A protein has these predicted regions:
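Conserved AMP-binding A3 loop
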Residues: 30-32, 144-171
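Conserved pre-ATP/AMP-binding loop-to-beta segment of ANL
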Residues: 15-16, 131-148, 155, 178-184
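Conserved AMP-binding/adenylate-forming core of the ANL superfamily
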Residues: 19-49, 54-63, 67, 71, ...
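A short helix-loop-beta submotif of the ANL/AMP-binding
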Residues: 55, 61-81, 85-89, 98-103, ...
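Hydrophobic alpha-helical segments in the ANL/AMP-binding
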Residues: 9, 46, 64-83, 93, ...
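Conserved ATP-dependent adenylate/AMP-binding module captured primarily in the ANL superfamily
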Residues: 85-113, 130, 169-186
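A short N-terminal helical cap/helix-turn-helix that marks the beginning
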Residues: 1-19, 36
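ANL superfamily adenylate-forming
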Residues: 109-141, 155
Length: 191
């Protein structure tokens, strides 16, 4: 069944041109490189005991590692909990407790911010041509992300997003924008 992870697989097999560009760092990646580096992070997470259905908090600066970590979590059938780097320890602790996060993906600068098992992504640039980790099968109704609200009327709430939600949103955006294979899209939202 087509979902976010298999969508990435399908594109990695047919596109060898750069599909991701970070102007801040001048990083450029094609779909196969993204899939290989995503697989390396997923392999590391699997070695940390992460499995389908586990909830993983991401606490990184805006970066390609953030995006690849998100894809890696989905590749394992786990559930991503994206957070913003401006969150305080108190805000993170609330989300960790509420979401029942099992692990936090972060970096050296933030490794001591809260008491939760951590994974710090290594230099994944070395894995651009690495071995692809097969994706865990997921259905459209499987949860892939807990997106916490701003909490303007109380405590933040974890909105449950499924693989089907994401895939449908991507499909609809491509239809509305009439995007074609050679089009360029600029993502401006912070992670």
């Amino acid at each position: 069944m087509l979902n976010i992870t298999t969508f990435l697989d399908a594109n990695a097999c047919r596109l060898d041109k750069n599909v991701l560009y970070n102007p801040k760092t001048n990083e450029k990646y094609n779909s196969h490189e993204i899939l290989a580096m995503t697989s390396e992070i997923a392999r590391d997470l699997k070695n940390c005991g992460i499995k389908k259905g586990d909830r993983i908090l991401i606490y990184l600066n805006n970066s390609t590692k953030y995006l690849f970590s998100l894809f890696a979590i989905w590749r394992l059938g786990a559930i991503a909990i994206p957070t913003n780097r401006v969150f305080t320890p108190h805000e993170l602790e609330y989300i960790i407790d509420d979401s029942q996060a099992k692990l936090m993906i972060t970096d050296e600068d933030a490794k001591d911010i809260v008491d939760l098992d951590k994974y710090i992504p290594k230099n994944i640039e070395n894995y651009k041509n690495g071995e692809i980790l097969p994706a865990e099968p997921t259905d459209w109704d499987d949860l892939c992300q807990l997106q916490y609200t701003s909490g303007t009327t109380g405590q933040p709430k974890g909105a449950m997003l499924t693989h089907g939600n994401y895939f449908t949103a991507i499909h609809n955006e491509c239809d509305v924008l009439t995007m074609k294979q050679d089009d360029v899209y600029m993502g401006i939202y912070p992670m």
